[in-house]
Amino acid sequence: TGWNGRFDVAKDDGAKVSYDWRTGIMDWEGYGIPKGAKNKDLAMKYIAEMMKPEYMAEFAKYITYGPTNGKVYELGLMEDSRAKMMPSHPDNAKHQLTLSTEWYSKWRTIAAEMYTEMMTE
């Protein structure tokens, strides 16, 4: 178990590792602005700027954590060989399980207990 970007760095450093997208789990992340923030409009502009596909394509040159803006793939902003290394590439994403925040909000406590029990047996 691990993050694809770390596996890819290890592989580039000569480690004998591999992984398969058919067993991958996609997770959700997000940006937030605290309620009452003084510079809310500026923060919104900053987030919008960071989400631009050209910046995401540039970032993906350095680590294989896939862009979250699908336009990176639609516009062909990455070399095809690099794009196919990303978990968010459509050919890879379709084989992965996407975590359900609704499920975890309901079952978090029980799931954590069961996971801890499984890992400590």
PLM features per residue range, with description:
Residues T1, A37-K38, M50, E102-K106:
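Residue-level detector of secondary-structure boundary/capping sites
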Residues T1-S18:
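Ligand-binding pocket segment of bilobal, Venus flytrap-like solute-binding proteins
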Residues G2-R6, R22-G24, G36:
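Histidine- and/or cysteine-centered catalytic micro-motif in compact active-site loops
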Residues W3, T68-K71, S100:
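Helix N-cap / beta->alpha transition motif
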Residues N4-F7, A43-I47, M56, R108, ...:
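Extracytoplasmic/secreted envelope proteins and their assembly/folding machinery
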Residues A10-K11, M50-E54, I63, Y115-M119:
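Sec/Tat-exported extracytoplasmic proteins
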Residues I25, E29, P34-H95:
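Mature extracytoplasmic/periplasmic domains
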Residues D91-E121:
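Conserved C-terminal helix/tail region of periplasmic/extracytoplasmic solute-binding proteins
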